[in-house]
From Swiss-Prot:
Descriptive protein name: Probable rhamnogalacturonate lyase A
Residues that span the membrane, as ranges: none
Signal sequence extent: 1-20
Cystine crosslinks: 50-93, 184-193
Record bears the keyword Disulfide bond: yes
Compartmental location: Secreted
Primary localisation category: secreted
EC number, as in UniProt: 4.2.2.23
């Protein structure tokens, strides 16, 4: 009985493998693509809308049946065609301002994609969303259920929820672009991963982050956000976005090094092959070696980045020709920039050097890394709402230099929650001359910015920062334009002995609780320097 049971249970698997046949099946309404892969993958694309309406992998239907997978919220209508050329199938979806491609290589359980645009979509963001069966694919990777909102009650807008006493949001699935080469959703028998080979036409730079996944109950969403208005810090880029790849597997997590160079032979709009690109090599120096160093290249058409080696040496990704701003970061804090010109088929050598420049420091809170790392609740803010019961109390806080820990200083100040923050420090008689209080921030909301009072002296009201028109801290963001505020302190203001600084959030706007005007602390938040 055992051997008979084993034989019959293996027969469907054998049949599935044997039936895999690479090709296109065409009907009046759709194209069905068979990848010809050992673990069979078939998917169906609507000929009228470009929606994926079915994804059958290893005998299971993974596509959510009530709504398709698509660009944006769906193209609505498009001119859709499909061609097979040897070992490759290409589906092309055309609108007036957008062309989307699905590409399959014979034998691979992968849907490769690329999206070419000449204008930003009317919804104000460019994304691909795969709406997949949440019963078969309930899990989100790598951050788990922080973005599983199924069964929750909305507590902020329509995108932050309370689920079993924990705050959750699709925004809490985000990862910095420089670290996000793969994100996945999975179940006991299937895994689907988005593999990101190319961010060159996206926006925001290496430290930008956006939504990656969201199990909302009816379906589990796997995204690639190419651009959006979510803490948007630079203009959108046109041209070809991608290639990017949706990889299907049974249990293993695929690697991120996927060769898509075959796109060069498939007549893909805007695709620049390796032969049409160049690189930049060099050495970075001068920044604090306690932090990772990043080199970043950007212009209106493209962006690239890389971590340096431990000795500062670097080689850029293959870049499109052009002249680029070249920036150098200590952590996420920019310490230098220059320009460099890249030519096709050649490597350009360009070194870069820079460091944090300060005067004689009386005290500082935190490190010059462009992040709120180490401050109160910074270890939780990426993955939960500030109101979450797992957060430590936001204060108001009194911080005493020399005895308080950096971890007791709030990573963000909210006008209606924990403003002001009070700092006490002791000065010697030699430190009572003119000084500068430098307050570094990474992100502002609703015009929130710091105004400082040192003993009886109140510094000037700073101008309002650029309005990014996007919720930040409550949706797991901390990086915006990075305003730094210097407050000149007249001689005699600081006294020998105990001194008190209070920093208030000021703004012409108002709001409740964590949606009141606020800013994120970093750089460090505060350095007191002798002039």
């Amino acid at each position: 009985m055992l051997s008979k049971a084993l034989f019959f249970s293996s027969l469907p698997l054998w049949a599935k493998v044997a039936s895999a046949a690479f090709g296109i099946t065409t009907t009046d309404s759709s194209y069905t693509i068979d990848a010809g892969s050992p673990n069979p993958l078939k998917f169906t694309v609507s000929r009228s809308s470009c929606d994926i309406t079915s994804i059958n992998y290893y005998g299971s239907e993974l596509q959510y049946q009530s709504k398709g997978s698509h660009i944006g919220s769906g193209l609505g209508s498009a001119s859709v065609s499909a061609v097979q050329n040897g070992d490759y199938i290409k589906v092309t979806c055309d609108t007036d301002t957008l062309t989307h491609y699905f590409v399959v290589h014979s034998g691979d359980p992968i849907i490769h994609m690329a999206t070419y645009i000449t204008a930003e979509p009317s919804i104000g963001e460019l994304r691909f969303i795969a709406r997949l069966n949440s019963n078969l694919l309930p899990n989100e990777e790598p951050f788990g259920d922080v973005s599983t909102t199924a069964g929750g009650s909305a507590i902020e807008g329509s995108d932050v929820f309370l689920v079993n006493g924990q705050t959750r949001s699709k925004f809490y699935s985000s990862q910095r672009f420089i670290d996000d080469q793969r994100h996945c959703i999975s179940g006991s028998a299937h895994r689907v991963c988005m593999i990101l080979n190319q961010y060159e036409s996206s926006s925001g730079g290496p430290f930008h982050r956006d939504i990656n996944s969201n199990n909302g109950g009816d379906y589990n969403s796997l995204y690639w956000y190419m651009n959006s208005g979510h803490v948007q810090t630079e203009s959108y880029r046109m041209g070809l976005h991608g290639p990017y790849s949706m990889y299907f597997s049974r249990s293993g997590t695929p690697g991120t090094n996927i060769d898509t160079s075959f796109f060069a032979n498939l007549d893909i709009k805007g695709y620049v092959p390796a032969s049409g690109r160049g690189t930049v090599t060099g050495k970075a120096s001068g920044a604090d070696s306690n932090f990772k160093w990043v080199v970043h290249w950007y212009n209106d058409a493209a962006q690239y980045w890389t971590y340096t080696a431990s000795d500062g040496s670097f080689t850029s990704p293959a870049m499109k020709p052009g002249t680029y701003t070249m920036a150098y970061y200590q952590g996420e804090y920019r310490v230098a920039e220059t320009s460099v010109t890249v030519s096709a088929g050649s490597s350009t050598t360009k070194n870069i050097s820079g460091s944090v420049k300060t005067g004689t420091t009386i005290f500082k809170i935190g490190d010059w890394d462009g992040q709120p790392t180490g401050f109160l609740n910074a270890d939780k803010q990426l993955r939960m709402h500030p109101s979450d019961s797992r957060m430590s109390s936001w204060g108001p806080v009194t911080y005493t230099v020399g005895s308080s820990s950096v971890g007791s200083f709030p990573m963000a100040l909210f006008k209606s929650v924990n403003s002001p923050v009070t700092i006490k420090f002791t000065a010697t008689s030699a430190q009572t001359g003119a000084a500068t209080l430098r307050i570094g921030t990474t992100l502002s909301f609703a015009g929130g910015r710091p105004q400082a009072t040192i003993n009886s002296y109140t510094g000037p009201t700073p101008s309002a920062p650029t309005n990014l028109n996007s919720r930040g801290v409550t949706r797991g963001a901390y990086r915006g334009l990075g305003e730094v505020y210097d407050v000149s302190i007249p001689a005699g203001t600081i006294v020998a002995g105990t001194n008190t600084i209070t920093i208030n959030v000021i703004s012409g706007s108002s709001g409740d609780d964590f949606l009141s005007p606020n800013f994120v602390s970093a750089y460090p938040f505060l350095t007191l320097m002798r002039c």
